[in-house]
Amino acid sequence: MTVLHSAPRWSSNEGVLDTLVAALGDMVAASREEHGEILLTVVRDRVEDALRLLRDDHEYQQLMDIAGVDYPQRAERFDVCYCLLSVTKNHRVIVKVSTDEATPVPTVTTLWPNAGWYEREVYDMFGVLFAGNPDLRRILTDYGFQGHPFRKDFPLTGYVELRYSEEDKRVVYEPVQLAQDLRQFDFMSPWEGADYVLPGDEKAVPPPPAPAPVATAPETKGDAKADVPKTTEQPADTGAGEKANDAAAKPVAEAAAPAATKTDEPAAPEPTEDRPARKPRAKKVADTEGATEPAAKPKRTRKKKEDGE
């Protein structure tokens, strides 16, 4: 048998904002509905009382998360956001308080024990202090870490480089070698009419273009088709005198290709030899059988032994 939960699958925000603002009274500093969420900004010193009232009287039983937001242009630059959930109404609400680097926020570990780690995360990342937290220390960064990484003025490269040294056989801390420029915050959007260069964008301005070179007439090495051929100006310029000038002035016809003829080319001459012919051999090679056969070996003869020897 399927048991259905009494909480609705979808809950509306209609009338919720007015009900909660009326219940909290002077503890509410501001309230609005944005992106389908109910946002309540309460007085910092009374945040514990406001959250207790929402938990006990309006059935927001669970603290789902505590988040921090940094607005460096404000005097109280940090917002601490408490995300609450009602499991019986299937509804969520966000409660916010504002603070700065030195002013602590009252802890809510007395209401939800899991708030201890959430407050430690906000302290580690943003540097927000929580008065009454029994174990307010870093939870995400390493021991001895300097600064708070989620602040807008924290450099992307950090201040210290953490690495393992093969020489020392241990983890060492070294200062970052990159140049750390001082960051300036200018929150005016360039799309709102800013007519100045934002800090860090000086290199993005293109340099003025180089002056154009003075135009000069193109140098001509000579006309490809000259109407009058170049001749000597004086007879003394050439050893041939004026006749050479007259000959140079006459147009020269282009050489034509040789006409094809149907006559056959003459045959090559017969080769001749000045050396006299060799005398014929007296005998043929076939008649020299005796000369080519090996000579016969002489036969050995033994002397007969005489009687009496």
Curated annotation (Swiss-Prot):
Membrane topology: Peripheral membrane protein
Keyword ATP-binding annotated: no
A Pfam family: Complex1_30kDa
Bias (Low complexity) ranges: 246-261
Disordered: annotated span: 198-309
Compositionally biased residues, Basic and acidic residues: 220-230
UniProt cross-references to SUPFAM superfamilies, sorted A to Z: Nqo5-like (SSF143243)
GO molecular function terms noted in the UniProt entry: NADH dehydrogenase (ubiquinone) activity; NADH:ubiquinone reductase (non-electrogenic) activity; quinone binding
Catalytic activity: a quinone + NADH + 5 H(+)(in) = a quinol + NAD(+) + 4 H(+)(out)
Main location: membrane
A single cellular component GO annotation: plasma membrane
Compartments reported by the entry: Cell inner membrane
Signal peptide: none
Keywords of this entry: Cell inner membrane, Cell membrane, Membrane, NAD, Quinone, Translocase, Transport, Ubiquinone
EC nos: 7.1.1.-
InterPro entries for this protein: NADH_DH_suC (IPR010218), NADH_quin_OxRdtase_su_C/D-like (IPR037232), NADH_UbQ_OxRdtase_30kDa_su (IPR001268)
Family (UniProt): Belongs to the complex I 30 kDa subunit family.
General function of this protein: NDH-1 shuttles electrons from NADH, via FMN and iron-sulfur (Fe-S) centers, to quinones in the respiratory chain. The immediate electron acceptor for the enzyme in this species is believed to be ubiquinone. Couples the redox reaction to proton translocation (for every two electrons transferred, four hydrogen ions are translocated across the cytoplasmic membrane), and thus conserves the redox energy in a proton gradient.
Subunit organization: NDH-1 is composed of 14 different subunits. Subunits NuoB, C, D, E, F, and G constitute the peripheral sector of the complex.
Protein name, as recorded: NADH-quinone oxidoreductase subunit C
Protein source organism: Novosphingobium aromaticivorans (strain ATCC 700278 / DSM 12444 / CCUG 56034 / CIP 105152 / NBRC 16084 / F199)
